[in-house]
Amino acid sequence: MANVTVYNMEGNEVGTMELNDAVFGVEVNEHLVHLAVVRQLANKRQGTQKAKTRSEVSGGGRKPWRQKGTGHARQGSIRAAQWTGGGIIFAPTPRDYEVKMNKKERRAALKSALTSNVQDNKVVVVDSLALADAKTKEMQKVLTNLKAEKALIVTAQEDKNVILSARNIENVQTVAANGINVYDVMSHGTVVVTKDAVASIEEVYA
């Protein structure tokens, strides 16, 4: 099992913690991590784009002028693509962007993402994030003490003070342990996680 240093909110070392290899020490599968990120971003797409093709635009059934003798270029319909108000060639239509992964793959991808961050020393474990008040200044001070930039803050449960304190800090995001996901883990420079959150993650994924 990997040993990591545990810090307090002042950035001082207060002990060590063993991380479960079944979650934080697996063989990293980069393909699954990539697939999980692609899936998450694709599944957020709305997919309701729509434009009308030539056959769907109203009007244009009559030839605008005769074929020859007018001096104009020949035209067959005022709803052809080159006309203002005409149809769109290869117009976008509503579609479902969903990418599927089974549960086993999703779990393996998250474990790989967490392991990769541990190996790269991007995981900072804190004994607690017990903020007395919801103040951005206090959270910024904690993150500075922990040398955590572009941080993902993971708590055991949703913590109102942590959420309110961090929401106005650029490139900082909060998530409860039960909502942790591959994209958030991989898109932040540092994962700041409480001891209780580590226990919650290990309980679910070990």
What are these regions (language model features)?
Residues 1-46, 91-206:
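Extended polybasic, low-complexity segments that bind anionic RNA or targeting/receptor surfaces
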Residues 30-68:
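A short, flexible low-complexity segment enriched in Lys/Arg and Gly/Pro that occurs
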Residues 4, 8, 18, 40, ...:
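Exposed boundary/loop context
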Residues 54-90:
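Glycine/serine-rich anion-binding loops at beta->alpha junctions
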